[in-house]
Amino acid sequence: MTDYKATLNLPDTQFPMKAGLPQREPQTLQRWNEIGLYSKLRKIGEGRPKFVLHDGPPYANGSIHIGHAVNKILKDIITRSKTLAGFDAPYVPGWDCHGLPIEHKVETTFGKNQPADLTRERCRTYASEQIEGQKADFIRLGVLGDWDNPYKTMDFANEAGEIRALAEMVKQGFVFKGLKPVNWCFDCGSALAEAEVEYQDKKSDAIDVAFPIEDADKLAAAFGLSELSKPTAIVIWTTTPWTIPANQALNVHPEFTYALVDTGERILLLAEELVESCLQRYGLQGQVIATAPGAALELIRFRHPFYERFSPVYLAEYVELGAGTGIVHSSPAYGEDDFRTCKAYGMSNDDILSPVQSNGVYTPDLPFFGGQFIWKANPAIVEKLAEVGALLKHQPIQHSYMHCWRHKTPLIYRATAQWFVGMDTQPKQGGTLRERALAAIEQTQFVPAWGQARLHSMIAGRPDWCISRQRNWGVPIPFFLHKATGELHPRTVELMEEVAKRVEQEGIEAWFKLDAAELLGAEAADYDKINDTLDVWFDSGTTHWHVLRGSHGLGHTTGPRADLYLEGSDQHRGWFHSSLLTGSAIDGHAPYKALLTHGFVVDENGRKMSKSLGNVVAPQEVNDSLGADIMRLWVASTDYSGEMAVSKVILQRSADAYRRIRNTARFMLANLNGFDPAKDLLQPEQMLDLDRWAVDAALRLQEEIIEAYADYRFWNVYSKVHNFCVQELGGFYLDIIKDRQYTTAADSVARRSCQSALLHISEALVRWIAPILAFTAEEIWQFLPGERNESVMLNTWYAGLERLPEGFELDRAYWDRVMEVKAAVNKELENLRTAKAIGASLQAEVTLFCDDAKQADLAKLGDELRFALITSAAQTAPLADAPADAVVTEVEGLKLKILKSAHAKCGRCWHFRADVGSHAAHPELCGRCVSNIEGEGEVRKHA
């Protein structure tokens, strides 16, 4: 028996079947570094339209987690796809470096009593170390960026830029000093930003407290009574007993109806709607003796339960009837609404009682409770209220309460003198900051769209922004305050520029070590130099000012706008929010044109990642076990607009999908063996119909893929590429071409046509996957035939795909119909295989009983119909001639009859043909194979 293997064009490639990504990816990273890929991208980007994705800086503390990986991979997919779309899309990574978590880490290591300058020095060193670790992990993910020149909020230039941004806001009149309740953490010893507050369940003491009447005659008159017949008290309900010592007012809603309720021993004042529930809570019987609107109670005085002072009634529309008594006890130092209401009634800052110190301990001079920590004082306060007969009910409750995101300890609102950016302050020119920011939101694209309403509601309802902190490790607020008046120095903006110049050279230490006389001269004696630092959200929120404005060549000289900010959904109240406020204040618009939000990562059961649950997926472990490309594929395949589920099982599914794409690429590379595009590439009109269809299908798909990338629908890109590999290619085209590819003459039109199509599809495919499978695309690129540059990323979307001409007979609809018929044939072949009536599909001879239209349709392929169906013989016949045992298919107008071929099997092409053995010199071959190895070779037109 002759071995005809040498006469076949068998597939051959050095492209490995086994990906070995954990070992191979680091080699690719090294190669990118050696060829200076990022620099080359910037070079070829010169003159292109610019697309700027501004990096929201991660905090320089701890190892990266799966959420960081998702964020950076999404950004990399975008910048890579924009590069392929013909943009100059730089990516400058950044880090957020100041703030309490780093300072806390340093204090934990070195103690709290070290000198402030040494603390700052150690914070800077610690942040630098953390950045290096995170940087290595981000690079390992395949993220292309300017890693040698990232921006860091602690860089001297950025610290100076932040001071200049603040100066702009001062100049426009947005910054003021005020006494206001702010989120306060005792452990931090500082105010917290809204984004640093999280909510957890907390057990609290809910108490109902009676405040006895002082202005009895006025109260009787308000209710239309001549007098009050019994002792009378107004009742409040609160879950913060520790605020009772600071009570200064009682708030009622002007439009609610209030009732005097006779309970036997005394009369209680309650909201009429809540009388029944309150009496039930107190275990009392009672009768309503009079009612009055809340507005009638204004300024009537009651007595504090245990201090010798009065609490007047103020009208406040924030009072609700959802719980309690309909009356709110007001401690203006410890509540935003309380503070606003008391200020509206003319209470001065000096009149506001603030007995809680920064560490949560009452001042020593507070009667009964001085020197006690507020949470520990709660039982003593409850006991005191009971002692004086003011406690109507005490009941522990579990409720959601604000906590410090770092220490996980409860927070309070605490009125302190702080620096604020005013939301409704009228600036020197233009609208208020709230008006500007709300208008800017309307001009911003949101992906997904619901982000717009979310950010709008946050801006519409937010209070003034407290930008000052009482910490060491932060950018200073370089203000001088007049000792007598408390006013800012009249040359503040000018002085801030002088400070910025020094900070540019020496860092923030330049301010802290500054002798005021150096800038103020003789005036220094009249001014205090303040040592407050800026909220870290002001740090990151002003990066558009110094990063986009030119320090990294990302923007314009004035009013820069990034094309895109991309972060997790929590950043609507974080970086998106602070950047919007600073951009609107300084430039009158948002610093971004579009905001893209991704969801949080959860496990396959929708639970948050937690070490205690054992469901944490660490990106470092995925890199080492499966490879970064698998993680990148998981990210791309997941709809990021909601929660993103990940687990080992889910990642294994991504690995399976990856294998399908890789194997498809490998098959095409193997069949491009010996193909030189410079001399072997055919023009479209020279190619077979099926090959032209495949190229046209790739072009149509490419158009959809480009659109999906532009719309940030990466899961659509993944599904389209995967389906193309599985269905159009793997399930149809690549199966059909094997016979022609392997058996026709090496240089025949039939084979070169097929190889031309494979090259076009491979050139397109490698670009489609490059933004997602960054490492694998680069690997494929190195194995593609023909002259090419060093990296797939140094190119744009493939322009060599050709559309089928208008009016082409075997158009895309035609091949769709052939696919439908082939699927029906395959289904019956599988049934016969299961019944062991047949082996390989080439053992089959199929008769297609068709209606007239379908018979005429399939007849266009002539004898090549058998190649399209991958059977040894295929013929059509009228539907009316179908025997009773013909198989009815799901295709309208088509029945099938499949028989096992009685002919001999060709030893070369494995077709079962009647002419096997008809050639004496090659008794094992069919006539077609003899022609292909000795004669002129077969001619194919269609398939």
UniProtKB/Swiss-Prot annotation:
Record-level GO cellular component terms: cytosol
Pfam families for this protein: Anticodon_1, tRNA-synt_1, zf-FPG_IleRS
Domain comment as written in the entry: IleRS has two distinct active sites: one for aminoacylation and one for editing. The misactivated valine is translocated from the active site to the editing site, which sterically excludes the correctly activated isoleucine. The single editing site contains two valyl binding pockets, one specific for each substrate (Val-AMP or Val-tRNA(Ile)).
Transmembrane segments: none
Protein's UniProt name: Isoleucine--tRNA ligase
Gene Ontology MF term list: aminoacyl-tRNA deacylase activity; ATP binding; isoleucine-tRNA ligase activity; tRNA binding; zinc ion binding
Binding site for L-isoleucyl-5'-AMP: 567
Residue ranges of the motif 'HIGH' region: 58-68
Reaction catalysis annotation: tRNA(Ile) + L-isoleucine + ATP = L-isoleucyl-tRNA(Ile) + AMP + diphosphate
Organism: Ectopseudomonas mendocina (strain ymp)
Quaternary data: Monomer.
Cofactor(s) required, per the database record: Zn(2+)
